[in-house]
Amino acid sequence: MCPFFSFLAPLLERLLAIHSLNRIYAEVRQRLVDLEQDPAFFMKTLQVMGTSVEIDQQSFERIPRTRPLIVIANHPFGGIDGVSLGALLSMVRPDSRLLGNFLLSRMDGIRGNIIKVDPFQREGSAQANFAGMREAIRWLKRGACLGVFPSGEVSSFHFRSLSVADPVWSSHIVSLALRTKATILPLYFEGNNGLLFHLAGLVHPSLRTLLLPREFSKMEKKTLRIRIGRPLSPELLSLMGDHPVTTDYLRLQTYALAKSAPGKIPLRQIKLPFWATQTGKDLSKTAPPQKKEVMSAEIAGLPASAQLLVYGNFEVYCAHVNNAPSNP
């Protein structure tokens, strides 16, 4: 081995916090009761790190305890958010798994807790992901729970929106929910990775990836805050259909949970993703105005599942034309 590399390697390990990651994993591994699948793997990781998760009790009770469930979330940290999601779901849904990077399956204790996918778009990735989706369908059809980060990669800084947000979400989540008649539950992680992480990503995405262990270890003895939204029923998703706008709606429902106080959303946290602000799109025409009394009566007659979003004085509904004849 080159003497210079022998000198440099320990410095790089400390700079990238590889030594901290190895220390955490070694201690977690000592606590495992099953090297293939330890149901408490995620919880034990949080305990070793001294990391706590803060959730509002009322919203915690919204998590459905039975039937097929897909929990979707933003991915601001690229590590600790996955561990926290796994720990949260294991508390209320012993039948839960995460849709995760196949590289994680090399770690003891976690293999049986994830359904493997390959996010690297290399030769063989499509076949691996097809197998992963088939396994996810079988899992959900058993009435189980699946945690998913629809972006498939960590949030990053976008110049167009001048904000940190997930990249474009995969539309496969909608297809998965429709095929399995699963409920979807949006969940929002507060916070972001550090400035150095995002500056490195502007130079090259690989530099951002190299800093993920550093960001993970920085969460030791920290508190992670999670906001949980309202469950979205299979009936509502079926009404909306398998369209890109449905994926956009799921993303909006997730990021709308970012509000820091009732009735207020910090503008820097809820900006639209950069691809949604591009010009040149053909926008649907707005329906002509209708009589207020007629619309009020029709809205009052809609089922509760037709309500998509409530924010301040605004309410958004989705209804079949048969239930809203005055709005063709």
Where are these regions (language model features)?
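Non-catalytic C-terminal accessory region of glycerolipid acyltransferases
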Residues: F130-C318
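Membrane-anchoring hydrophobic helices of lipid-metabolizing enzymes
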Residues: M1-I72, G82-S84, M91-R93, R111-G112, ...
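Gly/Ser/Thr-rich loops at beta-strand to alpha-helix junctions
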Residues: H75-G79, V154-S155
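Glycine-rich, phosphate-binding/catalytic loops in enzymes
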Residues: A87-S90, V164-D166
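Conserved nucleotide-cofactor-binding alpha/beta core module
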Residues: S90, P94-N129, M133-A136, L140
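Structural motif
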Residues: I70-I72, K116, G147-F149
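Short, flexible loop segments at the rims of nucleotide/cofactor-binding pockets, characterized by
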Residues: R14, L46-T51, R122-Q127, L162-S163
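Short amphipathic alpha-helical face segments that pack within enzyme cores
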Residues: I80-A87, H172-S175
